[in-house]
Design a protein with these regions (language model features):
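TRAFAC-class small GTPase G-domain
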Residues: 1-167
């Protein structure tokens, strides 16, 4: 039985967190989606060079009204994907706040910055996203939940990060 590693997918509402998880875990993409209330989670086994790991993927609601609930959801996480929407510059700017919020519960957290919705016309440059990721010591990947582009790479990156984090 592979070890289970808790990872968190965080970011503003409507950036596509749930869609990324469903694309990877279920191979589905739904154009209209119901908002996540509080938290949802799924699991999936990932094969890594050191052996398989089972990711327990926590999908955290992005709306501010759930902020008071979120700190409990971060506890015990091995890695975090900070997701923003490449068509919405505020969602990238808000990742600094997300990181600060998570670091209160998970000091020295390990992060992957994810630019989602690359199938749509972007307003956030790749360079700006790279600067943010580098400034926080995070790796950077781009994805499209709609087409599936980059989604396996995103989850492999977070699995590698989680498997090399000791708690």
């Amino acid at each position: 039985m592979p070890p289970t590693l808790k990872v968190v997918i965080a970011g503003d509402g409507n950036v596509g967190k749930t869609s990324l998880i469903r694309r990877w875990c279920e191979g589905k993409f739904e154009v209209s989606r119901v908002m996540t209330i509080g938290v949802d989670f799924q699991t999936k086994v990932v094969s890594l060079p050191d052996g398989p790991v089972k990711l327990s993927i926590w999908d955290v609601a992005g709306q501010d009204r759930f902020r008071s609930l979120r700190s409990g959801f971060y506890r015990g996480s091995r890695a975090v994907a900070l997701v923003y929407d490449v068509t919405e510059s505020a969602s990238l700017a808000n990742l600094a706040r997300w990181r600060e919020e998570i670091n209160k519960t998970v000091p020295h957290g390990k992060y992957v910055v994810v630019g989602n919705k690359i199938d749509l016309p972007r307003t956030v440059s790749v360079e700006a996203a790279h600067r943010f990721a580098e400034g926080t010591g995070a790796s950077y990947v781009e994805t499209s939940a709609a087409t599936g582009e980059g989604v396996p790479e995103m989850f492999e990156a977070i699995a590698r990060l989680a498997s090399h984090t000791t708690r």
